[in-house]
């Protein structure tokens, strides 16, 4: 399997914070992930430190046998802190304190100057830069223009459509009303959304006029919906967290990661 799996360990820390004690330790998850065949560790250092803390970041970077990809907002203090630690990659993401999880891609146009300056800072520190974006062609062009080295395509819309179409979510109090389409319409929307992701991945990695970007994908991916995304040849990496950690409660973290790698191979 050529596509890589980055395991997001945010919710290991979420479980720890539920009791405000010292376990489970996110660092321990790093070594389990390596043994299970993960290719990378991903986590989000949020402004409110709701799960991962600064001390976690430092310990994990210093001790991890796997490459580290840190997600963060355009926050000057966080950027300075991370540049001092020099992880392999930093992925810039949008952030709202009131959100449960990241709700969409970066608004590159409105933050153009800040993103440009931040990417230059990453480059000077030898840190690979990525932008978390919605699968829109204009965002790909802007990412190229800014000098990003990679993009991660936000798969949340696809994931939510799949949940509403093929799970019991639509019959619960968690139903996503904005995705409550009739059966035929929701399947057509899934197909369109997948095509948007595939076309953006192809555009990102093309060599026309300028250097290609590496293309990753993530958000809301689970064991049922990951196969179609993993089959897009231009996507070289998936970053997945919640579904792996949720399954690990029942089967253990190592087995949950192995099962995800197997699901990524299913067409």
Swiss-Prot record:
3-amino-2-oxopropyl phosphate binds at residues 8, 19, 220, 241-242. It is an enzyme of class 2 (transferase). Its EC number is 2.6.99.2. Signal peptide: none annotated. The active site is at 44 (proton acceptor), 71 (proton acceptor), 219 (proton donor). It catalyses: 3-amino-2-oxopropyl phosphate + 1-deoxy-D-xylulose 5-phosphate = pyridoxine 5'-phosphate + phosphate + 2 H2O + H(+). It comes from the Bacteria. Keywords: Cytoplasm, Pyridoxine biosynthesis, Transferase. GO terms for molecular function: pyridoxine 5'-phosphate synthase activity. InterPro entries: Aldolase_TIM, PyrdxlP_synth_PdxJ, Pyridoxine-5'_phos_synth. Pathway: Cofactor biosynthesis; pyridoxine 5'-phosphate biosynthesis; pyridoxine 5'-phosphate from D-erythrose 4-phosphate: step 5/5. The record marks 152 as: Transition state stabilizer. GO terms for biological process: pyridoxine biosynthetic process. It is found in: Cytoplasm. 1-deoxy-D-xylulose 5-phosphate binds at residues 10-11, 46, 51, 101. Gene3D superfamilies: Aldolase class I. HAMAP family: PdxJ. Belongs to the PNP synthase family. NCBIfam families: pdxJ (TIGR00559), PRK05265.1-3 (NF003625), PRK05265.1-5 (NF003627). Homooctamer; tetramer of dimers. This is Pyridoxine 5'-phosphate synthase. It comes from Helicobacter hepaticus (strain ATCC 51449 / 3B1). The lineage of its organism: Bacteria, Pseudomonadati, Campylobacterota, Epsilonproteobacteria, Campylobacterales. The gene is pdxJ.
């Amino acid at each position: 399997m050529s596509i890589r799996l980055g395991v997001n360990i945010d919710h290991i820390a979420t479980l720890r914070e539920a009791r405000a004690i010292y376990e489970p330790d996110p660092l321990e998850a790093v070594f389990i992930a390596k043994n299970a065949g993960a290719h990378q560790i991903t986590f989000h250092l949020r402004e409110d430190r709701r799960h991962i803390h600064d001390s976690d970041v430092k310990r994990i970077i210093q001790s991890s046998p796997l490459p580290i990809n840190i997600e963060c907002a355009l926050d000057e203090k966080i950027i300075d802190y991370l540049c001092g630690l020099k992880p392999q990659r930093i992925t810039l993401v949008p952030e709202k304190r009131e959100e449960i999880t990241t709700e969409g891609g970066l608004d590159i146009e409105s933050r153009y100057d800040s993103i440009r300056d931040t990417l230059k800072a990453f480059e000077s520190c030898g840190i690979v830069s990525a932008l978390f974006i919605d699968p829109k062609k204009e965002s790909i062009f802007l990412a190229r223009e800014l000098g990003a080295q990679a993009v991660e395509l936000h798969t949340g819309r696809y994931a939510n459509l799949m949940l509403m179409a093929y799970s019991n979510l639509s019959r619960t109090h968690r139903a996503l009303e904005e995705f409550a389409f009739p059966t035929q319409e929701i399947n057509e929307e899934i197909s369109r959304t997948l095509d948007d992701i595939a076309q953006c991945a192809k555009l990102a990695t093309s060599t026309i006029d300028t250097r290609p970007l590496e293309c990753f994908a993530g958000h809301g991916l689970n064991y049922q919906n990951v196969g179609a995304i993993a089959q897009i040849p231009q996507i070289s990496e998936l970053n997945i967290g919640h579904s792996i950690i949720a399954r690990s409660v029942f089967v253990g973290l190592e087995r949950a990661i192995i099962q995800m790698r197997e699901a990524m191979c299913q067409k």
